């Protein structure tokens, strides 16, 4: 088995690369994927988003080590174990990120990845329905749309934000991110539009693309060059040879794990694991970042929430309507309103994100109260806390050791306390007067800093946006793992391209930036000229230095 390019992982970036590397017919591509089929309602029905993440069949099911700042809780850290990777089990929320995110990447050493450089790739990948003209792509493979937003609670949330003095935005993925508006999702024709649907499945119809179901054990490195991948399938160890390059695209947990199993990583740690050190790169597995969030939940005085649809027999009606007609509530992830806000004067870009949901419910689908309600998923998205991914042993099948070190930076506590109080202010606006009942969570008795901190320690959870563990940077940065061309520093014929190479978190969900990374990396790999830099200037709040709104 051999191909010009061997891609480990069929996730957001891996699927995009498989398509772009093979589209001219000149190169052969093999995609290695351990996970199984994405066919079936649990993945394809948008409203069923809670199911695949709770199923071992689709999710690697990782847990963090006990988190000291969060009452030593082990935090769930899901990653997709299925065709399409995490794009097949995520919440389908589409956020490009803020322009300043990518400008920060370039400042951190990722030359050629500033906003002006990446915007053309976002446009190339998008098939936007109703986005801002001139800022959005309209003929790409990834369908992006807004929900119908028929529930009055969505509009109450947006109106409440305006009443509180915040901006509104018609398209947060266009020229103006800041403000309250309708949220976009990667769904189309009533179903999830994953990277597998957008990129991989069309690519697999080409004679030069092959998908191999297997477990990737390590990258084979000979004389300083990656020559293939050692895999296991059917109980046998085999080698898939790469005539040109091996591209690791296995997630922010498994990409550094694979590099370390291959002898690339912190030398002392590899020696402790009994692994021969091929390249001593201390940055492999370091720089782990993630978004955290909590649910702010309120009862509703009017029976307008989705609570009526939670009983099993009502869910059956939703499922049947989706199955036979691809219509109804099943066609949306129900995250149809949002906000991107700045936490304080002097903060230039939004750093607080809201997902609004017209029901009070946990991510696993359990109701928060036996009544109608609504909630906001609230997160401070520019945390300075950093963690690491390391090996548990030299056994390729052992789960990685994941230490996020959540809330280890004092600023995180200040920002999340502000998030609690800010949400109370928003939910307290006139737009919610007809709907607002008693507060469920955090609860009316949670008021002081100490009380809020106690709530946060017990209720903060991951937003499932890990990144940064194979950081992209300049070759003279000792903590960089890949250079701005996505090449692993010190090894020929080996690249990494997924969210693990992000130097820093983007402001928002990571599926969109991950796909963009695959799109752009493909041009680097093929040696193509980069798409022409954009000269469009995004909107920055003119009051940012003196006001938070």
From Swiss-Prot:
InterPro entries registered for this protein in UniProt: BetA, FAD/NAD-bd_sf, GMC_OxRdtase, GMC_OxRdtase_N, GMC_OxRtase_C
EC numbers on record: 1.1.99.1, 1.2.1.8
Signal sequence coordinates: none
Pathway assignment: Amine and polyamine biosynthesis; betaine biosynthesis via choline pathway; betaine aldehyde from choline (cytochrome c reductase route): step 1/1
A molecular function (GO) term: flavin adenine dinucleotide binding
GO biological process, one term: glycine betaine biosynthetic process from choline
Catalytic residues, chain numbering: 465
Residues that bind FAD: 4-33
Lineage top rank: taxon: Bacteria
Names of the cofactor(s): FAD
Catalytic activity as recorded in UniProt: choline + A = betaine aldehyde + AH2; betaine aldehyde + NAD(+) + H2O = glycine betaine + NADH + 2 H(+)
PROSITE patterns: GMC_OXRED_1 (PS00623), GMC_OXRED_2 (PS00624)
UniProt KW keywords: FAD, Flavoprotein, NAD, Oxidoreductase
Pfam families from the UniProt entry: GMC_oxred_C (PF05199), GMC_oxred_N (PF00732)
Family to which the UniProt record says this protein belongs: Belongs to the GMC oxidoreductase family.
Function: Involved in the biosynthesis of the osmoprotectant glycine betaine. Catalyzes the oxidation of choline to betaine aldehyde and betaine aldehyde to glycine betaine at the same rate.
HAMAP family, sorted: Choline_dehydrogen
UniProt name for this protein: Oxygen-dependent choline dehydrogenase
Organism: Rhizobium rhizogenes (strain K84 / ATCC BAA-868) (Agrobacterium radiobacter)
């Amino acid at each position: 088995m051999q191909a010009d390019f061997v891609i480990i992982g069929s996730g957001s970036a891996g699927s995009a690369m498989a398509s772009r590397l093979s589209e001219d017919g000149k190169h052969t591509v093999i995609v290695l994927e351990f996970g199984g089929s994405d066919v079936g309602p649990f993945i394809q029905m948008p409203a069923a988003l809670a199911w695949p993440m709770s199923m071992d069949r689709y999710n690697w099911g990782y847990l963090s080590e006990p988190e000291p700042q969060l009452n030593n809780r082990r935090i769930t850290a899901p990653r997709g174990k299925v065709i399409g990777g995490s794009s097949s089990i995520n919440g389908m929320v589409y956020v490009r990120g803020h322009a300043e995110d990518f400008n920060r990447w370039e400042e951190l050493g990722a030359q050629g990845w500033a906003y002006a450089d990446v915007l053309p790739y976002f446009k190339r990948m998008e098939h936007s329905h109703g986005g801002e003209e001139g800022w959005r792509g309209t003929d790409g493979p990834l369908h992006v749309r807004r929900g119908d937003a028929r529930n009055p609670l969505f509009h109450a949330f947006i109106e409440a934000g305006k009443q509180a003095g915040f901006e509104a935005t018609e398209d947060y993925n266009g020229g103006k991110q800041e403000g309250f508006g309708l949220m976009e999702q990667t769904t189309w024709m009533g179903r999830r539009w994953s990277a597998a649907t957008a990129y991989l499945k069309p690519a697999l119809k080409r004679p030069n693309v092959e998908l191999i179901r297997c477990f990737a054990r390590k990258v084979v490195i000979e004389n300083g060059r990656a020559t293939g991948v050692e895999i296991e399938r059917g109980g046998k160890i085999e080698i898939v040879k790469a005539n040109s390059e091996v591209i690791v695209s296995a997630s922010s947990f498994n990409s550094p794990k694979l590099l370390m199993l291959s002898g690339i990583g912190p030398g002392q740690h590899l020696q402790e694991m009994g692994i021969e050190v091929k390249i001593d790169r201390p940055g492999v597995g370091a720089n782990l970042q993630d978004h955290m969030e909590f649910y702010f939940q309120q009862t509703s005085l009017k029976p307008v929430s989705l609570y009526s649809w939670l009983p099993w027999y009502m869910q059956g009606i939703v499922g049947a309507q989706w199955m036979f007609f691809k219509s109804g509530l099943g066609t949306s992830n129900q995250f149809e309103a949002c906000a991107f806000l700045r936490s304080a004067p002097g903060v230039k870009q939004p750093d607080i994100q809201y997902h609004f949901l017209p029901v009070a419910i946990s991510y696993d689908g359990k109701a928060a109260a036996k009544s109608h309600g609504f909630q906001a998923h609230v997160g401070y998205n520019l945390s300075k806390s950093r963690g690491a991914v390391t090996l548990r042993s030299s056994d390729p099948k052992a789960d990685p050791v994941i230490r996020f070190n959540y809330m280890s930076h004092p600023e995180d506590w200040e920002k999340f306390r502000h998030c609690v109080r800010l949400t109370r202010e928003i939910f307290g606006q006139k737009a919610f007067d007809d709907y607002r009942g008693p507060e469920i969570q955090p609860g009316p008795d949670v008021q002081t800093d100490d009380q809020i901190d106690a709530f946060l320690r017990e209720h903060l959870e991951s937003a499932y946006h890990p990144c940064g563990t194979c950081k992209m940077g300049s070759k003279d940065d000792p903590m960089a793992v890949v250079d701005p061309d996505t090449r692993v520093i010190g090894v020929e014929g080996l690249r990494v391209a997924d969210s693990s190479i992000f130097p820093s978190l983007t402001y928002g969900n990571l599926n969109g930036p991950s796909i963009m990374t695959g799109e752009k990396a493909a041009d680097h790999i093929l040696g193509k000229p980069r798409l022409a830099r954009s000269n469009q200037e995004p909107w920055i709040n003119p009051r940012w230095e003196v006001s938070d709104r």
